[in-house]
Amino acid sequence: MSIKEDKWIREMALNADMIHPFVNGQVNVNEETGEKLISYGLSSYGYDLRLSREFKVFTNVYNSVVDPKCFTEDIFISITDDVCIVPPNSFALARSVEYFRIPRNVLTMCIGKSTYARCGIIVNVTPFEPEWEGHVTIEISNTTPLPAKIYANEGIAQVLFFESSTTCEVSYADRKGKYQKQQGITVPCV
């Protein structure tokens, strides 16, 4: 497997709708206001995806237990805003602005941006498997003892694309993966 460069990512986004909407280049300043942004868009060997305005922040209002086999949404507070405050030592779910369609011979890895990591904000996203498509559900942990701010419509993580020299026998779409074509923030399901 080899990592794919900006030219390949651009061609796949524009000709195969692999990333929608696609931003051709790094954006780090709001052109209208001059405000600095956490960068997003096409980079040399990846694509920096953005957070949407949808967030789900963990709360313990009902004294619940997090159980991935029996997950209830009453452990979340849903927020729609340009920023989200993640409580100290807590966790939030969000989704990407971008919708991805991964080719059959490609696997991605997603790595959190250093700007957030240096603030104690850790991002986890599982690989996008061959022929998976959907909005990306993003797990965000605030490892600090302080509230942490995350920004909608700005970069949160970088997606790296790896192309195999051979095609897999069974893709995510073939096995009817449970998170196929997910819209919005998708909570755990078994």
Swiss-Prot record:
The keyword Hydrolase applies. Its EC number is 3.5.4.13. Keywords: Hydrolase, Nucleotide metabolism, Nucleotide-binding. It is an enzyme of class 3 (hydrolase). GO terms for biological process: dUMP biosynthetic process; dUTP biosynthetic process; nucleobase-containing small molecule interconversion. CDD domains: trimeric_dUTPase. Pathway: Pyrimidine metabolism; dUMP biosynthesis; dUMP from dCTP (dUTP route): step 1/2. NCBIfam families: dCTP_deam. Homotrimer. This is dCTP deaminase. It comes from Chlamydia pneumoniae. The lineage of its organism: Bacteria, Pseudomonadati, Chlamydiota, Chlamydiia, Chlamydiales.
